[in-house]
């Protein structure tokens, strides 16, 4: 790696004021990776002449498809001019001119949104990239919402100016209007996102927005053009720069000439989009250069750009047209320079960010030792260690690197640490809790460098790091600490769900062991992918969408199992629910007939289901407070909640409604275990239950504990929960996509017909300005989405396309009483695919009688 030393990175890791941890986020194909390449080249990680580009896309399928599939990190070392820092940052906010940029390039395709979530969790700022022609698209909104949920500060890059100028040939006036609309649209969207965390509008005149062509490697903020014109306006210094920057974005003033160097030009207080300061002083010079490049007038280009103090020394300008324009523009306005300034000046350091995020990130009390250390980003040797592992990255030795962020303390090789899995709560001695703790030693600490990694001696708070040696005790994510009383860092909340699944098997029976090992590694490597094995021995993989599933199957066969596999047709992930309550207690007996359990069930309020993950707590008092403050619910039963399930993403409750049973707490863990087992394996089609509140009403128990152990109680509780679901009007919930279809106006009718034929809805029609295109937004059941894009292209001669993202779960139409209904047919088909008995069991088959 030319001119790059890992020792310099480690030195800068100690200077928290000058660390910038950032994610690059965008809609697919909006140009994130090409912009990232500009920064990597600027940092001299690779040479500007190295072919291919897309340095951060290390996978072969990423290079072939031209999209990012896995987020990848790199640590870059940059310098910013001292006078610029002094002028545009507060005193004390920075320390020196050298900056460490820990950058994560994340995917733009909606199927890989979980990778974006994992990146945002460990960063402090986001570089949001938006195609200036297409504007905010469905995935832009998704990732921006994720950033707001994680309390990440954004800054905006309006990219692909080359597309507007060279390909679509926008006139200056139109481009100026489009860019202004993009800024306004972004800020309007920003204002609607986030609940407890709001950020102010981003403004070009504050240099919070840059205008770039990542493909050609050029870009600018208004500050750069303001500096060009200081002499013309008889101004100097940074105060003059600020005034000119405000002037350049003003829409209330217009110019009397198109030539920025016309000596007679005047500025009048009358709006005129064709002669706004931005068009005249910023866009017109760029279009002038384009015209000269088209005619191959190299000497005239050099002469014209003397006005802007451009030095072409060492730059060979030849040819004409697009290639010459690219060379001239990236020499005049290098994209890396303006983006670097944005990152250094407008995004927060860990010291600033963690003051905003600590109370959201940390599950424990906001004033305990660990919370205070996170808040202050304390990286001293004495500080408690708190690190969050957001994903596991495969290494070359068939193991995994635990990748994450150190929020407090310092981590080094040989250090003794506690690895706490999601769901752990300090103070609880229940087996289900203590099994989530692992005492380990750190073998190595490494920084990620795109396609590889480098060892560092240690890592203090505020940095992104990889740890080697703990992959055997982390399934996907977790908290690392060195304090017994430390609570977990909050688990991530994904914007997508694993709604598409497929059954997989080994092509050769003798490869079953390798398949199982490969499935475990696949589940560990992907933040969202869920691998399950049912009691019939069938393995399934659940993913966010069809592309995510395709990638996971390829990785399973080629990278993890390394054996031929067979994949069945894809299914969608359903939830099992109920439509009514069962208020008369139902009963089951233990195998020895000495114990009886009585329960009822009722549907949970949807508001509780949607927010259960955020309000749950192991402490009854805290739980009651959370329900009251966040959901405005004050019911007495809240203090009697025994258990939530599933554990990671709870959707159901078990409440203790018994009275006067002195030994009831002695069976609590056994009942909870049976409840969890039932919730994860519903009786209809073996899927997870959703929105059920089970209440334990009574228990008749043997006096001797040996006769009421878990072996006696687990199965009766499991049976009771399953039977209650079947007795309460069982329903299925199916996943629904929000769909955004772009189609020529002439085909909007045909496209709408296709959408409606697949049980979709068309909720909004918007004509896009300037290109005779309609955008249709609506919903589409995931089950109907597998061939949707192909059907659209067939019905529009290849001219329509759709973007889809997970929206919500909705009740599947029909019922189990009508053989012609969709629900009946779905239950029948899924049970057949899962090799279950064709008809669901009856409620009474699970209950016992006195």
From Swiss-Prot:
Gene3D superfamilies noted in UniProt: 3.30.230.10, 3.30.70.240, Elongation Factor G (Translational Gtpase), domain 3, P-loop containing nucleotide triphosphate hydrolases, Translation factors
* Primary localization: cytoplasm
- Choose one Gene Ontology CC annotation of this protein and give it: ribonucleoprotein complex
PROSITE patterns per the record?
G_TR_1 (PS00301), G_TR_2 (PS51722)
Q: What's its top-level EC category? A: hydrolase
Stretches assigned to the tr-type G domain: 17-351
- Diphthamide carried by residues: 707
Query: What keywords were assigned to this record?
Result: Cytoplasm, Elongation factor, GTP-binding, Hydrolase, Nucleotide-binding, Protein biosynthesis, RNA-binding, rRNA-binding
Question: Pathway of this protein?
Answer: Protein biosynthesis; polypeptide chain elongation
UniProt EC number: 3.6.5.-
Binding locations of GTP: 26-33, 159-162, 213-215
Question: Which subcellular locations apply to this protein?
Answer: Cytoplasm
What SMART domains does the database record attribute to this sequence?
A: EFG_C (SM00838), EFG_IV (SM00889)
Catalyzed reaction equations: GTP + H2O = GDP + phosphate + H(+)
Which is an annotated GO molecular function term of this record?
A: rRNA binding
Q: Which NCBIfam families match?
A: small_GTP
Q: What does this protein do?
A: Catalyzes the GTP-dependent ribosomal translocation step during translation elongation. During this step, the ribosome changes from the pre-translocational (PRE) to the post-translocational (POST) state as the newly formed A-site-bound peptidyl-tRNA and P-site-bound deacylated tRNA move to the P and E sites, respectively. Catalyzes the coordinated movement of the two tRNA molecules, the mRNA and conformational changes in the ribosome.
What PANTHER family does its record include? ELONGATION FACTOR-LIKE GTPASE 1, TRANSLATION ELONGATION FACTOR-RELATED
| Record-stated family | Belongs to the TRAFAC class translation factor GTPase superfamily. Classic translation factor GTPase family. EF-G/EF-2 subfamily.
| Protein's UniProt name | Elongation factor 2
This protein's encoding gene:
EFT1
């Amino acid at each position: 790696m030319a001119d790059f030393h890992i020792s310099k990175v480690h030195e800068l890791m100690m200077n928290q004021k000058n660390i910038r941890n950032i994610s690059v986020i965008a809609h697919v194909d909006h140009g994130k990776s090409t912009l990232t390449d500009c920064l990597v080249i600027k940092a001299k990680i690779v040479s500007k002449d190295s072919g291919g580009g897309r340095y951060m896309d290390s996978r072969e399928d990423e290079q072939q498809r031209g999209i990012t599939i896995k987020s990848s990190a790199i640590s870059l070392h940059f310098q910013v001019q001292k006078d610029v820092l002094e002028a545009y940052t507060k005193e004390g906010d920075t320390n020196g001119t050298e900056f460490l940029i820990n950058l994560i390039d994340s995917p733009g395709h909606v199927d890989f949104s979980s990778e974006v979530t994992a990146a945002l969790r460990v960063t402090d700022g986001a570089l949001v990239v938006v195609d200036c022609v297409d504007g905010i698209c469905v995935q832009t909104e998704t990732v921006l919402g994720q950033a707001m949920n994680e309390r990440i500060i954004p800054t905006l890059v309006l990219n692909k100016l080359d597309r507007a100028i060279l390909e679509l040939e926008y006139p200056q006036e139109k481009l100026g209007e489009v860019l202004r609309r993009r800024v306004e649209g972004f800020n309007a969207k920003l204002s609607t996102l986030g609940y407890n965390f709001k950020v102010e509008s981003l403004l070009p005149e504050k240099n919070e927005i840059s205008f770039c062509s990542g493909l050609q490697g050029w870009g600018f903020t208004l500050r750069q053009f303001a500096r060009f014109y200081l002499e013309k306006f008889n101004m100097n210094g940074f105060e003059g720069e600020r005034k000119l920057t405000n002037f350049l974005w003003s829409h209330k003033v217009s110019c009397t000439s198109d030539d920025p160097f016309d000596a007679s030009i005047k500025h009048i207080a009358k709006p005129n989009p064709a002669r706004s300061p931005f068009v005249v002083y910023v866009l017109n010079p760029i279009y002038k250069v384009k015209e000269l490049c088209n005619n191959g007038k190299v000497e005239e280009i050099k002469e014209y750009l003397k006005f802007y103090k451009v030095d072409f020394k060492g730059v060979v300008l030849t040819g004409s047209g697009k290639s010459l324009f690219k060379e001239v523009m990236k020499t005049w306005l290098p994209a890396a320079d303006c983006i670097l300034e944005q990152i250094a000046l407008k995004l927060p350091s860990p010291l600033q960010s963690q003051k905003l995020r600590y109370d959201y990130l940390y599950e424990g009390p906001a004033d305990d030792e660990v919370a205070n250390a996170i808040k202050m980003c304390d990286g001293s040797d004495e500080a408690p260690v708190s690190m969050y592992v957001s994903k596991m990255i495969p290494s070359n030795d068939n193991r995994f690197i635990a990748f994450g962020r150190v929020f407090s303390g310092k981590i080094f090789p040989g250090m003794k640490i506690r690895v706490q899995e999601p769901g752990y709560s300090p103070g609880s001695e229940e087996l289900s809790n203590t099994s989530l703790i692992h005492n380990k030693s750190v073998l190595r600490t490494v920084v990620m460098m795109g396609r590889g990694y480098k060892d560092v001696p240690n890592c203090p708070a505020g940095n992104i790091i990889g740890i080697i040696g703990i992959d055997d005790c982390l399934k996907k994510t977790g908290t690392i600490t060195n304090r017994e009383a430390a609570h977990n860092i909050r688990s991530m909340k994904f914007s997508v769900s694993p709604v598409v699944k497929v059954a997989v098997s080994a092509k050769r029976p003798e490869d079953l062991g390798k398949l199982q090992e490969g499935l475990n590694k696949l589940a560990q490597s992907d933040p969202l992918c869920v691998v399950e094995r049912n009691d019939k021995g069938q393995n399934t993989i659940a993913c966010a969408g069809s592309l995510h599933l395709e990638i996971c199957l390829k990785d399973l066969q080629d990278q993890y199992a390394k054996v031929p596999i067979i994949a069945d047709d894809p299914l969608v992930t359903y939830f099992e629910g109920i439509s009514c309550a069962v208020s008369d207690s139902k009963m089951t007996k233990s195998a020895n007939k000495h114990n009886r359990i009585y329960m009822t069930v009722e549907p949970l309020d949807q508001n509780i289901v949607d927010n259960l993950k955020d309000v749950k707590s192991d402490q009854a008092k805290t739980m009651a407070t959370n329900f009251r403050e966040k959901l405005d619910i004050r019911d007495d039963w809240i203090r009697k909640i025994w258990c939530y399930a599933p554990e990671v993403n709870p959707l159901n409750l078990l409440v203790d409604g018994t009275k006067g049973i002195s030994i009831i707490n002695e069976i609590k863990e056994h009942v909870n275990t049976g409840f969890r087992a039932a919730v994860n394996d519903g009786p209809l089609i073996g899927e997870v239950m959703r929105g059920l509140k089970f209440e334990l009403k009574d228990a008749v128990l043997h006096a001797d504990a040996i006769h009421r152990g878990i072996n006696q109680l687990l199965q009766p509780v499991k049976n009771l929960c399953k039977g209650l679901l079947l007795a309460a009007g069982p329903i299925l919930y199916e996943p629904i996509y929000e769909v955004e279809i772009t189609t020529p106006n002439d085909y909007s009718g045909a496209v709408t017909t296709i959408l409606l034929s697949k049980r979709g809805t068309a909720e909004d029609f918007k004509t896009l300005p300037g290109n005779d295109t309609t955008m249709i937004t609506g919903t589409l059941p995931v089950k109907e989405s597998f061939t949707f894009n192909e059907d659209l292209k067939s019905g529009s001669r290849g001219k329509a396309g759709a973007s889809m993202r997970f929206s919500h779960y909705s009740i599947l139409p029909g019922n189990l009483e009508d053989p012609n209904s969709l629900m009946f047919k779905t239950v029948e088909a899924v049970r057949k695919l899962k090799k279950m008995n064709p008809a669901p069991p009856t409620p009474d088959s699970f209950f016992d009688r006195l």
